[in-house]
From Swiss-Prot:
Name listed for the protein in its UniProt record: 3-methyl-2-oxobutanoate hydroxymethyltransferase
Gene that this polypeptide is encoded by: panB
PANTHER family: 3-METHYL-2-OXOBUTANOATE HYDROXYMETHYLTRANSFERASE
Cofactor(s) of this protein: Mg(2+)
Active site: E208 (proton acceptor)
UniProt keyword annotations, A-Z: Cytoplasm, Magnesium, Metal-binding, Pantothenate biosynthesis, Transferase
Record's cofactor remark: Binds 1 Mg(2+) ion per subunit.
């Protein structure tokens, strides 16, 4: 009989009645404690990005338990070519909007490039703004071993931290957009990074563009939840950029993106129909007019 490796062994799925995060009975604001408890139950959960109150409200009503106000807003919302130009002021404004648009989801605010790299004190100042001014329930920052001290101080100060290792978009100028953790040395470094952020007190860690087998090993090794994006099916949670997932981004999508709708076409068709009605004089009709 062929034996399955630990990475291939099917993991038990909780019964629907044991769900707490998605499809569960939590009708209050979800907390970090709820997230860590989900790993203990073996409950998987979804996370989506959000950058504005209206979109966030739709996802909140749909039961999405965690939303990331990512610095991916730079590409998807603000018109930048990368995430690097995004400022802390912009992240604070966007995070506050998402918090206002939700009542249940845990909102995680991204610390943008240049807001924590100088050291723990700068990281604390920046994270405090997101918590105090925007009202987020946690912050996210990139880096493994190199961000250990920042994470440690934030957690000691009462600010929950979601770490982010593997492909870290803020380092695109030095790393490029490529799979991380291939090869023995790179895999061992990623494992060290994962353990470092856990030891520093992070409550979860994003694994981006990491070989599925390595992501599975990290997930088995850590006691904190792993959140995959391009990291295979065995992480504790999954995250996608909402404009990719709903087909608004356009162009060629990364291999790991599953497109669940084609909003770009829906919106484009609607805009054209509206324009034709205006030009043709059929809008506004009598039922759209005040008398």
């Amino acid at each position: 009989m062929t034996q399955l490796s630990a990475a291939q062994t099917p993991q038990p799925k909780p019964a629907d009645g044991n769900r707490a995060l998605y499809g569960g009975k939590i009708n209050r604001r979800i907390t970090v404690r709820d997230i860590t408890a989900a790993k203990e139950r073996g409950e998987k959960w979804p996370m989506l990005t959000a950058y504005d109150a209206m979109t966030a409200s739709v996802f909140d009503e749909s039961g999405i338990p965690v939303m990331l106000v990512g610095d991916s807003a730079g590409n998807c919302h603000l018109g930048y070519e990368t995430t690097v130009p995004v400022t802390l002021d912009e992240m604070t404004m966007l995070s506050a909007a998402v918090v206002r648009g939700t009542s249940r989801a845990l909102i995680v605010g991204d610390l943008p490039f240049g807001s924590y790299q100088e050291g723990p004190v700068q990281a604390l100042r920046s994270a405090t703004r997101l918590v105090k001014e925007a009202g987020v329930g946690a912050v996210k920052l990139e880096g493994g071993e190199r961000s250990h001290r920042q994470i440690e101080l934030l957690v000691e100060s009462g600010i929950p931290v979601m770490a982010h290792i593997g492909l870290t978009p803020q380092s695109v100028n030095s790393m490029g957009y490529r799979v991380q953790g291939r090869g023995e040395e790179a895999a061992q470094q990623l494992l060290r990074d994962a353990k470092a952020v856990q030891d520093a007190g992070a409550f979860a860690v994003v694994l981006e563009l990491v070989p599925a087998e390595l992501a599975a090993e990290v997930t088995r090794t850590l006691h904190i939840p792993t959140v995959g994006i391009g990291a295979g099916p065995d992480t504790d949670a999954q995250v996608l950029v909402w404009t990719d997932m709903l087909g608004l981004t356009g162009g060629r999508m990364p291999k790991f993106v599953k497109q669940y709708a084609d909003l770009r076409k829906v919106m484009g068709d609607a805009a054209k129909a509206y324009a034709e009605d205006v030009v043709g004089g059929t809008f506004p009709a009598d039922e759209h007019s005040v008398h």
